[in-house]
């Protein structure tokens, strides 16, 4: 919106210095600053409002340290989503299909998360929205993204193909499996970030690092020269995704101002499902979804810890008559909590691991 206004003045009157608005790096930086300022300035009032209405219920089986947070407000994801949407509308070419497809994913799963949080907090429905309906929403979003990118010429014939990390000019053609792959990745990532959101700042900080990396890949993929040099798929117009990524990064960082230990607010499913779906759609659009097991490694480990715990418990119960556990508690961060690790130490160590995964992902650009 603001971009189009400044673009009009620049092309009509050509005032000195206004041409900078045409640079992708300027608009990405402006979106980042705008998103951060909105979150920081709106945060205190938003927290006061939520504290008077929406208090996060804490499970009785949660670690003792976690049960102390029973009086904190949830649904903080609304603040993240608002900051992202406003920043993107102001500084991106929001008629670009890449942009609004990501924004659709953020809003779509944000609404699903809000319904889940509302049912838990206000309606006092144990468990909130049933897993079945969450899955229906995730599959529906995957269908929309998959079908639209398959049919819209703006996404070209490359959408059914993807690059393979560590291999130069090697691609995989999904063919008829493209839409199921899209559904799986969106479902897996949104659930993975949701599972990770269990400690102060863990999900927001980790998401910021992952999306920052994806923003770098998007910038490179949107430039034909860089894409050719690095042997990654060239995505026409994909550079606009970098603007969206920076808005998401700084909205998450701004939220971290209030969500770091000791937290003043939780993002709830409203934020975690929205961020997870955004990560998935961005990776799909820039053809780096096969890099997600590395880049989003922390989210993968958290999800695997839950899956392994459940499967092992069921197996041992069937084999020995009594279920046994590998971890003290799943997801993985709660295991370390029960081992006596301080919450801040767990979060910072997980951030460090995420940064290591980020750097490993960058190495794949040259290790081909």
From Swiss-Prot:
What would you give as a GO molecular function for this chain, any one?
A: metal ion binding
Q: In which pathway does it act?
A: Cell wall biogenesis; peptidoglycan biosynthesis
Question: What sections of the protein cross the membrane?
Answer: 30-50, 72-92, 98-118, 139-159, 170-190, 208-228, 238-258, 264-286, 345-365
| Class of this enzyme | transferase
- For this protein, what is the EC number? 2.7.8.13
PROSITE patterns registered for this protein in UniProt: MRAY_2 (PS01348)
Which reaction(s) does its UniProt entry say it catalyses? UDP-N-acetyl-alpha-D-muramoyl-L-alanyl-gamma-D-glutamyl-meso-2,6-diaminopimeloyl-D-alanyl-D-alanine + di-trans,octa-cis-undecaprenyl phosphate = di-trans,octa-cis-undecaprenyl diphospho-N-acetyl-alpha-D-muramoyl-L-alanyl-D-glutamyl-meso-2,6-diaminopimeloyl-D-alanyl-D-alanine + UMP
Necessary cofactors: Mg(2+)
Record's keyword terms, sorted: Cell cycle, Cell division, Cell inner membrane, Cell membrane, Cell shape, Cell wall biogenesis/degradation, Magnesium, Membrane, Metal-binding, Peptidoglycan synthesis, Transferase, Transmembrane, Transmembrane helix
Q: Subcellular localization, per the record? A: Cell inner membrane
Gene Ontology cellular-component terms for this entry are: plasma membrane
The organism's place on the tree of life at top rank = Bacteria
Topological type in the membrane: Multi-pass membrane protein
Show the CDD domains listed in the entry: GT_MraY
The role this protein plays is: Catalyzes the initial step of the lipid cycle reactions in the biosynthesis of the cell wall peptidoglycan: transfers peptidoglycan precursor phospho-MurNAc-pentapeptide from UDP-MurNAc-pentapeptide onto the lipid carrier undecaprenyl phosphate, yielding undecaprenyl-pyrophosphoryl-MurNAc-pentapeptide, known as lipid I.
Q: Which family is it part of?
A: Belongs to the glycosyltransferase 4 family. MraY subfamily.
* UniProt-listed HAMAP family: MraY (MF_00038)
> What is this protein called in UniProt?
Phospho-N-acetylmuramoyl-pentapeptide-transferase
Taxonomic source organism? Chlorobium luteolum (strain DSM 273 / BCRC 81028 / 2530) (Pelodictyon luteolum)
């Amino acid at each position: 919106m603001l971009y189009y206004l400044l673009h009009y003045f620049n092309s009509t009157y050509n005032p000195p210095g206004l041409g900078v608005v045409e640079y992708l790096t300027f608009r990405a930086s402006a979106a980042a600053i705008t998103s951060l300022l909105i979150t920081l300035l709106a945060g205190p009032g938003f927290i006061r409002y939520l504290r008077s209405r929406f208090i996060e219920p804490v499970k009785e089986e949660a670690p003792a340290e976690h049960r102390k947070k029973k009086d904190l407000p949830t649904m903080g994801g609304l603040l993240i989503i608002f900051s992202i949407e406003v920043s993107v509308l102001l500084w991106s070419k929001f008629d670009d299909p890449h942009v609004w497809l990501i924004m659709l994913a953020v809003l779509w799963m944000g609404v699903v998360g809000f319904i889940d949080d509302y049912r838990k907090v206000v309606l006092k429905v144990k468990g909130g929205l049933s897993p079945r309906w969450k899955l229906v929403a995730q599959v529906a979003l995957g269908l929309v993204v998959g079908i639209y990118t398959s049919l819209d010429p703006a996404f070209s014939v490359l959408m059914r193909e993807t690059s393979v990390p560590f291999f130069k000019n090697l691609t995989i053609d999904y063919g008829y499996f493209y839409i199921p792959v899209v559904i799986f990745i969106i479902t897996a990532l949104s659930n993975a970030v949701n599972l990770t959101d269990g400690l102060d700042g863990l999900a927001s900080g980790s998401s910021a690092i992952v999306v920052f990396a994806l923003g770098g890949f998007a910038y490179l993929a949107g430039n034909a020269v860089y894409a050719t040099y690095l042997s990654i798929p060239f995505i026409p117009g994909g550079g606009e995704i970098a603007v969206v990524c920076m808005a998401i990064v700084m909205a998450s960082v701004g939220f971290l101002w209030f969500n770091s230990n000791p937290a003043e607010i939780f993002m709830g499913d409203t934020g975690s499902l929205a961020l997870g779906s955004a990560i998935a759609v961005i990776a799909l659009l820039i053809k780096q979804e096969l890099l997600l097991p590395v880049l989003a490694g922390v989210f993968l480990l958290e999800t695997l810890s839950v899956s392994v715990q459940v499967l092992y418990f069921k197996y041992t119960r069937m084999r020995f008559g009594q279920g046994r556990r590998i971890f003290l508690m799943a997801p993985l961060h709660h295991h370390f909590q029960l081992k006596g690790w301080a919450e801040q130490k767990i979060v910072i160590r997980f951030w460090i691991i995420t940064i290591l995964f980020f750097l490993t992902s960058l190495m794949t650009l040259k290790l081909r």
